[in-house]
A protein has these predicted regions:
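Conserved G1/Walker A P-loop phosphate-binding module
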Residues: 3-95, 272, 284
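Conserved catalytic-core segments of large NTP-driven translation/proteostasis enzymes
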Residues: 17-38, 61, 68-69, 199-284
Length: 284
């Protein structure tokens, strides 16, 4: 057999890029608090909210969470067999929280592989929630519903760093009933404003159909509860349903999205981009 034929039979190991995740939802439902929580798991605690006029994110902010932090977080999940993922990290895009910034939110939606739609589990859907779903559907972006502020459920007992799946099942029966009531309210709102069925991720992930279903992840960004659940669901969805888009082909022409363009003193015109395909080389 020729060397050429042998080469053709060798499996080429696939290398994945980071999934790009848009973070969107109604103002004050917890987008920035979630991103603060993500940044804090690396030991570098920040509070973006304090640096923003009126507490509203006015530009697209990028947060890169590397794989070592993802592994550390997901290892705390109460699974018998610990899941393994190939992604080198996750890139989160924070989108504006004011309705006048709809065009920028739309830009973020078109960049993303997956989105997380944050909803205050007690308040439910608001106008920007509905707008976000419409944008995500128009761009064919799969999304996860995050039921944030689960600690607002009466007598809910939070524990920082705990899986929200574990926490949900450790609450008293009365508290679980109240949490279920809020969940079923969200389920109805999702059905009213989209074509999708909603399921708690621990009940629906094995039978998940991306054409018809969306997963629900409860959490408390304020109390640091349920972050590992969200990271797990993001990676599980991305590597299963968006895998072809994540595979890096180094010889391909570079493709990506310009997030911002500006003039910098002493440097000149600069652009911030997210590279989604191929490789950028000197001289391109």
């Amino acid at each position: 057999m020729s060397d050429e034929a042998n080469d053709e039979m060798v499996d080429v190991e696939e290398t994945l890029r980071q999934p790009i995740v848009a973070v969107t939802g109604h103002v004050d439902h917890g987008k920035t608090s979630l991103l603060d929580l993500l940044r804090s798991i690396g030991g570098n605690k920040t509070n973006v909210m304090n640096r923003e006029a009126g507490g509203i994110t006015q530009e697209l902010g990028v947060t890169n969470v590397p794989s070592e932090l993802l592994v550390k977080a997901i290892q705390t999940m109460p699974f018998k067999d610990k899941p393994k993922f190939e992604s080198p990290g996750i890139i989160f895009l924070d989108t504006p929280g004011h309705e006048s910034f709809g065009s920028i939110r739309n830009r973020s939606g078109s960049v993303a592989d997956i989105a997380i739609l944050i909803v205050d589990i007690v308040e439910g859907f608001k106008p920007q929630t509905i707008q976000s779903i419409q944008i995500l559907e128009e761009n064919n972006i799969p999304f996860i519903i995050v039921g944030n502020k689960i600690d607002r459920v009466h007598r809910w007992e939070s524990k920082r760093g705990r899986s929200s799946w574990q926490s949900w099942n450790e609450q008293s029966q009365d508290v679980q009933k109240m949490a279920d009531d809020f969940y079923y309210k969200l389920l109805g709102q999702v059905a009213s404003h989209s074509k999708f069925n909603l399921a708690k991720y621990w009940e629906g992930i094995k039978t998940f159909d991306i054409k018809n279903d969306r997963l629900f992840v409860p959490m408390s960004a304020k109390e640091g509860e349920g972050l590992q659940d969200l990271l797990f669901v993001i990676l599980a969805m991305a590597e299963k349903f968006a895998r072809e888009d994540l595979i890096i082909h180094e010889q391909d022409m570079a493709e990506g999205y310009v997030l911002e363009s500006r003039e910098e003193i002493g440097v000149g015109k600069t652009i911030d981009i997210i590279l989604t395909k191929g490789t950028i080389r000197v001289g391109d």
